[in-house]
Amino acid sequence: MSEYHTPVMLDESISALVSNPSGTYADVTFGGGGHTAELLSRLNEDGHVIAFDRDSDAISNRIDDPRLTMVRADFRFIHNFVLNEAHETQDITLREKLTGGLDGILADLGVSSHQFDTAERGFSFRYDAPLDMRMNREGGKTAADVVNEYSGEDLERILRIYGEVDNARKVAQLITSARDKSPIGTTGELDEAIKAALPKFAEHKYLAKVYQALRIEVNHEMRSLEKFLEGAADTLRPGGRLVVITYHSLEDRMVKNFIRTGSADGKEEKDIFGNIHAPLKAVNRKPILPQESEIASNTRARSAKLRIAEKNDGGQER
């Protein structure tokens, strides 16, 4: 599993998650199964884990353990799945646990090492490969569809918002100019199309932002994250924990806002007395960052931030 993806902040995340070794938990970003394996190791025979992933490559890493239920689905469906499973499962004990809510939910956001390192997935500018970027390759638009079919205005918008790309308008113009001559079908063709916009001494950092923007658009990542957070809050039992590892400012801001206010955009909803009713409360006011030793052994951990929240009993008033 480590060859597929090295789990980030493994001990910190699982230690924060597990309060009851007999409890029921969800790992909604299964990937290589590293977090799930560690979670299972800390549960007793009565514990149970539900693991989600929409990528068929990840599902093939399933762990042979009767305490594990694998679900091939986007994590935004967690609440619907738990509600349905609570009514339909033949396992009476699991049904009772699900009816009471989950004890904890873990989400390790972003792209797995396997997805980055598999050239034909098209997630990385390090390889000249088809411009795909779909986490679920069985349907939906590809990154090639986005760069060839979106208007210049829409390209500029997603580059600016999802990638926080400097000079997004110029990049969008370069893309539309290149595709007018010939469709852009590979990562190499995209890199060539926008090379005039790349800063001389920070090409890779700039390209990473462009690719991030396209990937987020292709996979509806921000929309899925918002729906997941809402579903997670509804699915946790009072006192249950939500543990989220983020990798860029957009998703971290959304997670932070939701924990603080119960709204992805950070807008506070108050009652007539001026109290804010939020479903979660922060356990750590500041995010936990990876140790230097972990960053040295796994460079993809360097931008990670770990946030921990706990489900309130009846909503929080401030």
Residue map of PLM features:
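S-adenosyl-L-methionine-dependent methyltransferase catalytic core, i.e., the SAM/SAH-binding region
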Residues: 1-318
